[in-house]
Design a protein with these regions (language model features):
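Short "lid" loop at the C-terminus of a central beta-strand within the Rossmann-like core
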Residues: 129, 150, 173-177, 201
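Conserved SAM/SAH cofactor-binding pocket of Class I
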Residues: 60-149, 155-156
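SAM/dcSAM-binding transferase cores
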Residues: 181-236
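Conserved beta-strand signature within the Rossmann-like core of class I S-adenosyl-L-methionine
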Residues: 165-175
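Class I SAM-dependent transferase core
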Residues: 2-75, 105-120, 125, 226-228
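Helix-to-beta-strand junctions that scaffold the AdoMet/dcAdoMet cofactor pocket
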Residues: 92, 162-164
Length: 236
């Protein structure tokens, strides 16, 4: 269904190489996504080219910023229908991936897809602000998120999961640089430090701003706060 050569070409352009098995898995995942989307609202993007560019290639841009090795613990916070988590797992099946979301129906699809692809992952049904205060706190080498929350809000949800010395990769759109400017204080409060930023253009003209936040100190125990408080009074 999807154009595997297009996916391979796009990813090679940002120095991410996919082997034959990965490309076969992407084709199967695309089929699963389109089929399940008929009964469950996973995505508005269902055309083959859109899936390749806006879901698969876009998710894999994170590998420009982070380089997880075998056994590294990675968490995708707010994975939804499995993005960027499943594409990252297809490209790097040796990582220990956790995909977290608060919507059970979407996670059922994520679980079904991981099983069908012959991969392994830890699927967690929980709210990020609650999971980030429990046993998952500061246990991950990398956190990634494509969630739509503002950067300062996203950092409060994600940085508590990252161990000191680890990295949070925020996958933002065209306003990522502006959002980062408004989030620097929050990043510092949460124990982070901006490490690097890169902007990429996808073939459809979409802009992806990738921001790496290095965890340099423990997150204070009062964070993350309850979601209502995060929304009402974001760190700034």
């Amino acid at each position: 269904m999807i154009d595997k050569n297009l996916l391979k070409k796009i990813c090679s352009g940002f120095e991410v190489e996919l082997d034959a098995q990965a490309l076969e898995r992407f084709e199967l995942f695309g089929e699963l996504l389109v089929e399940k989307n008929k009964v469950l609202n996973l995505t508005a993007i269902t055309d083959p080219e859109g899936i390749v560019i806006k879901h698969f290639a876009d998710s894999l841009t994170a590998l420009r910023m982070i380089d997880p090795k075998a056994g590294d613990r990675v968490i995708d916070v707010g994975t939804g229908g499995g993005f960027p988590g499943i594409p990252l797992l297809i490209a790097r099946p040796e990582i220990e991936l956790t995909m977290l979301d608060s919507t059970q129906k979407k996670l059922a699809f994520v679980t079904e897809s991981v099983d069908a692809l012959g991969l392994r992952a830890n699927i967690v049904h929980a709210r990020a602000e609650e999971a980030g205060r429990g046993t998952m706190r500061e246990t991950y080498d990398f956190a990634v998120s494509r969630a739509v929350a503002a950067m300062n809000v996203l950092c409060e949800y994600c940085l508590p999961f990252v161990r000191v010395g680890g990295t949070f990769c925020a996958m933002k759109g065209s306003k990522g640089t502006e959002e980062l400017g408004n989030a620097e204080k929050a990043i510092s409060i949460l124990g982070g430090e901006t490490e690097k930023k890169e902007t990429l253009l996808l073939p459809d003209g979409g802009e992806r701003t990738l921001i790496n936040i290095k965890k340099i100190s423990h997150t204070a125990t009062k964070y993350p706060r309850p979601s209502a408080q995060i929304s009402k009074k974001p760190l700034a």
